[in-house]
Amino acid sequence: MKLWTYLLYPSLLACLSLQSQSPMPSVRGSCDTLCNCEEKDGIMIINCEEKGINKLSQISVPPSRPFHLSLLNNGLTMLHTNDFSGLTNALSIHLGFNNIADIETGAFNGLGLLKQLHINHNSLEILKEDTFHGLENLEFLQADNNFITIIEPSAFSKLNRLKVLILNDNAIESLPPNIFRFVPLTHLDLRGNQLQTLPYVGFLEHIGRILDLQLEDNKWACNCELLQLKNWLENMPPQSIIGDVICYSPPPFKGSVLSRLKKESFCPTPPVYEEHEDPSGSLLAITSSTSDSRLSSKNTSILKQPTKAPGLIPYLTKPSTQLPVPYCPIPCNCKVLSPSGLLIHCQERNIESLSDLQPPPHNPRKLILAGNIIHTLMKSDLTDYFTLEMLHLGNNRIEVLEEGSFMNLTRLQKLYLNGNHLTKLNKGMFLGLHSLEYLYLEYNAVKEILPGTFNPMPKLKVLYLNNNLLQVLPAHIFLGIPLTRVNLKTNQFTHLPVSNILDDLDFLIQIDLEDNPWDCSCDLVGLQQWIHKLGKGTMTDDILCTSPGHLDKKELKALNSDLLCPGLVNNPSMPTQTTYVIVTSPTVAADTASTLFSSLTDAVPLSVLILGLLIVFITIVFCAAGIVVFVLHRRRRYKKKKVEEQLRDNSPVHLQYSMYGHKTTHHTTERPSSSLYEQHMVSPMVHVYRSPSFGPKHLEEVEERNDKEGNDAKHLQRSLLERENHSPLTGSNMKYKTTDQSTDFISFQDASLLYRNILEKERELQQLGITEYLRKNLAQLQPEVEVNYPGAHEELKLMETLMYSRPRKVLVEQTKNEYFELKANLHAEPDYLEVLEQQT
């Protein structure tokens, strides 16, 4: 009985454990054991990055749930048939940064729902016709940074929904004809390959829907074969984004942009393109360059048009040249790329040192040592590899790079050091890499980069530093380096200065800064303004704030500057570095002024700034016009005033108003005796209009008094006329008659009447200073009878005008020995106009 108990007890425990564990994989899969999972919008996101996975069978996913799967930076080397058969609900799969060198036929079977596939940063060399079988709904394919040299003609023929294809940074020299005939591409990236030409027939004619085409960093041969591409680019719609085609050869055009070259300069006699048809009706139009071609493992069929018997189209099959296979070090695999190059595959071979590869192969072109256990790279390890163009040391355990380890690699263009244990970078590590264009340092533990680290690489274009531990960068670290793509994401940056770091990236096309713990404070204002200056598509993703708490997960670009740093703009007393630079250096002052102007344009939208400047300009124009009108008006008034003054100067009567309200003072001046009359000037006729104080009623009283004192008046009048005859106002040749006296004027018929009227008007005439004058001088008048005084009425009318009209604050100049004479400049418009009218 005990024996049966001992036998059944383990079996019972095993059954219970299976029953308790069997439901878990069906519900959670690898989420509880191997991977990290989260659900978002009903879709599972399964993160299996850096888990050491080398077989897809290690992955199990929840059933009947759509999901995104990330297998970044694992140890996958090959994709076998039906490897993804258990992942039928996958929407996207990321296989980047592995060591995948081959994909078997049917590897993607069962992925009918897959929309995105990432196989970038692997070791693929060829894309076969059936590589992507089973991906009928694929829309996005990323295969950059591999070693792809060959793409077979029907590799993409089944991808009828593919819109985005990324093939940059491979070694593609040519594309087969009609490769995209049935592919509705809108975005195509072919940067960093070996392309020399792209013909219209068989290629350009099938990408008419393209919106974004990147063609930089290829070996374009600017000759007549490139004329079709130039014509096609010129006819593209303006909304399309087309990268620059920069000539690589011939030497006279190296570095020139194709779009700026004239057709006659690189193709004096345009060729006549003929279409050659094969029996299947396809056009053979794209061929690789004969000067730098790679030979595939298959035979190449060359089609020639016959010069005789045009009815026959013979096919000449030329076998590929059999090159002697050079020595290949064990345990590596070698492949001949061309008569002058060798590709050496040594990945995943447990190699600890390059000294194990002895003797070194002859004339190696590419050396792949990814996925080994190399700890140290010695200076002597690569001495015999001076012909290398690509060196892959990714996913090793390299901690030390001796100074000068790459000294002999003067031809090296691509260097992969990703996935190692490097902690510090310095200048000595990269000595000798004068031709290097691509440097991959991601997924290390780099904490410090010393100044001048990248100076030995004057041609460096692509730099990957993502997924490290960087917090700061030294000043001028990118100065003089023609970088076009920089990846700094997933580091420890809280802020990144623009001055002396980011503003040295003069050739920048793309930069990655996301997934850093950005502190959205005053230190990030400059970075925000710099981001606003970047062109569309330069930033691959948005920068999100981590601190302070109220700005967590806020997009930096969308924040206002005053929210990042309150009071920064409105605090003029805050000392800044530019304040001191302006005083000390004129050169830096100009840079500071441009910086201030650029800051202004960043803070204010350009459209608003232009509108404001336009308003200011219009305001200035109107102000200037107003000033001109005012000046002209003043000039006209001045001229008019001069004319009036001339008229006053020509008149014997001068009245001048006092400028003040006080009593006027009397000024005595000398006046020429008869200058006016010697110039034959006619004395004005002054009509005395009866004022209210001397009207008809007053005249009746005067007549009554005249009856009593008539005789005295006659004597007084004669005396006045006699003295007037000797007055300076009259010339010696003038004769007057009293009989010419007009009835319109009021005459003096009684001396007492004259004095009485003067006394009544004395208060009003005090400002004129005439009363005292009359009291002193009229008593001395001796009347004479029978004096002929023909102009006496003019003088009398003038006297009556001055005495009986309303006083105007007039300055009257008088002399002691003469009959009173008026010498004042007239400024009283109503009286003066009346005088002029009567004179006329």
UniProtKB/Swiss-Prot annotation:
Ranges annotated as biased composition (Polar residues): 727-736
Domain (LRRCT): residue spans on this chain: 218-269, 516-567
Cell division found in the keyword field: no
Extracellular side: 23-609
Tissue expression as described in the entry: In the embryo, expressed in otic cyst, lateral trunk epidermis and underlying mesodermal tissue, limb bud, maxillary process, cochlea, retina, tongue, tooth primordium, central nervous system, and primordia of visceral organs including lung, gastrointestinal tract and pancreas. In the central nervous system, expressed primarily in dorsal thalamus, cerebellum and medulla.
Cellular component aspect of the GO annotation: cell periphery; cell surface; membrane; plasma membrane
Domain LRRNT positions: 22-67, 319-360
Localization per record: Cell membrane
One Pfam family of this chain: LRR_8
Keyword Chloroplast: no
The protein's name in its UniProt record: SLIT and NTRK-like protein 6
Species per Swiss-Prot/TrEMBL record: Mus musculus
